[in-house]
Design a protein with these regions (language model features):
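ATP-binding N-terminal substructure of ATP-dependent carboxylate-amine bond-forming enzymes
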Residues: 2-120
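Internal nucleotide-binding/catalytic subdomain
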Residues: 182-322
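Solvent-exposed alpha-helices and their adjacent loops that cap or buttress functional pockets
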Residues: 20-23, 45-46, 60-62, 110, ...
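Short, conserved charged micro-motifs
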Residues: 77, 158-159, 191-194, 369-371, ...
Length: 451
């Protein structure tokens, strides 16, 4: 997108009226390679003077920035790249580098002091990295959540007793990160006890050495996104995602098969409850713990008869929710993240579109179980009135776009209503072809009844 010999301190282009414009160049590095990172890069590339690099990126991010072949676990290589390319801002997409301490690495290295980074340090990332820690935090600071019991091999009998004390279904959560697969919801008590034993025996490796047993919360789930500089915050557009592989919320859990934003039941009254009961106590708690948190907080909430409860904290944006949310954020997103990193979010104007975004995720045949990779994709050049965010794509030797993951591409459309937006999204999704392509046909249908 940008030539290698681009001026070092400025970016030049013509605006919509053909006027020559010059802006201070801002080199931005987005870490990650999925649909979330494509959406972040897509939005950041619209900022004045932005030159966006993505590590590792995918076939879609190559259209909005420059892909860089650096592993997310190689902090030294990331540092060297930031220095060489004079990176101004780093945006961390996935949770693993945050839990592994990439923000601490940046803060502690004198050579990187001029580089801003969006995300919490290792302590802050424990809100997602350890469900037991998150539960203790919520209890300590009065954040509403489900009743729970933390169990390991030393108190297994007490864990069994807790299971017997609550009603089905039974919720078992691996304490640590388990690639989104560490939560089991079971209807049979004996099966729950059996699976609890398997988890403690290493079903999810070290992640399930401790298991959090939770009382099941009934209601409708919603994802609420907060951007905070530690003192101030803004609520980004909320979204509802669809976890199950099949229509009608049937079949296996996935990373997410689609999203809708905004969510009809997230009224001003409901969101005020979220702020007063959850966001403000969470930020107060982080400050009390001495955690300087500058980044995203993704609140996985349950709406139980108009009352919000926290199911989980995440310390980054959601996927596929980001693919819907980013299309509704107005203004210069890099300015917003700059202000976040600088501790001056209160000084920046933030606005969001009133239109509805619907995202439909196309996945590989067989996903979320075994699937093929390398399937040639077609129809991408036929798309109109949508943004297609690549999740699992790459280029083959002949420069064809091919599949490289279970979740392949997210098609996002806007409309005045859910019905209008989903109509466009599905119309365009049908144009994308590859062997085994699969997607849900009911994204947003449940919410249309509420709108």
């Amino acid at each position: 997108m940008y030539p290698a010999d681009i001026e070092k301190d400025a970016v030049n282009w013509k605006d919509a009226q053909g006027q020559h414009v010059t802006a201070v160049r801002r080199n931005i590095l987005v870490l990650g390679s999925g649909g979330r990172e494509h959406a972040l890069a897509w939005k950041l590339a619209q900022s004045d003077g932005a030159v966006v690099y993505i590590a590792l990126g995918n076939a879609g991010t190559a259209q909005v920035g420059i892909n860089v072949n650096i592993k997310l676990s190689d902090f030294k290589a990331i540092k060297d790249f930031c220095i060489k390319q004079e990176i101004h801002l780093v945006v961390v997409g996935p949770e693993q580098p945050l839990v592994d301490g990439i923000v601490d690495f940046f803060k502690e290295d004198a050579d990187l002091r001029g580089v801003k980074i969006i995300g919490p340090d290792r302590r802050g990332a424990q809100l997602e990295g350890s469900k037991a820690y998150a539960k203790d935090f919520m209890e300590k600071y009065g954040v509403p959540t489900a009743k729970c019991f933390k169990v390991n091999k030393d108190n297994l009998d007490e864990g069994y007793k807790f299971l017997e004390s609550v009603n089905a279904p039974y919720v078992l959560k691996a304490d640590g990160l388990a690639a989104g697969k560490g939560v089991l919801i079971l209807n049979d008590l004996q099966e729950a006890k059996k699976e609890l034993g398997k988890m403690l025996d290493g079903k999810f490796g070290a992640a399930s050495a401790t298991v959090v047993i939770e009382e099941f919360l009934k209601g409708i789930e919603v994802s609420v996104f907060v951007l905070t500089d530690g003192e101030h915050y803004v609520l980004l557009p909320e979204a509802k995602d669809y976890k199950r592989i099949g229509d009608g919320d049937t079949g296996l859990n996935t990373g997410g098969m689609g999203a809708v934003s905004p969510v009809p039941f997230c009224t001003p009254d409901f969101l005020d409850k979220v702020e007063q009961r959850i966001v403000k106590p969470t930020l107060k708690g982080l400050k009390a713990e001495g955690i300087d948190y500058r980044g995203f907080i993704f609140l996985g909430l349950m709406n139980d008869n108009g009352n919000p409860y926290v199911i989980e904290y995440n310390v980054r944006m959601g996927d596929p929710e980001t693919e819907a949310v980013m299309t509704r954020i107005e203004g210069d997103f890099a300015d917003l993240l700059d202000a976040c990193a600088d501790g001056r979010l209160n000084e920046v104007h933030y606005a969001k579109s009133n239109k509805t975004a619907v995202t439909v995720m196309l996945v590989s045949g067989g996903y979320p179980e075994a699937y093929k990779k390398g399937m040639v994709m077609s129809g991408l050049d036929l798309l109109k009135d949508v943004v297609a965010f690549h999740a699992g794509t790459t280029f083959d030797a002949d420069n064809n776009v091919v599949t490289s993951g279970g979740r392949v591409i997210a098609v996002t459309a806007h409309g005045e209503s859910i019905e209008e937006a989903r109509g466009v999204a599905y119309r365009e999704a049908e144009k994308i072809r590859f062997e085994g392509v699969n997607y849900r046909h009911d994204i947003g249908l449940d919410l249309m009844k509420m709108q």
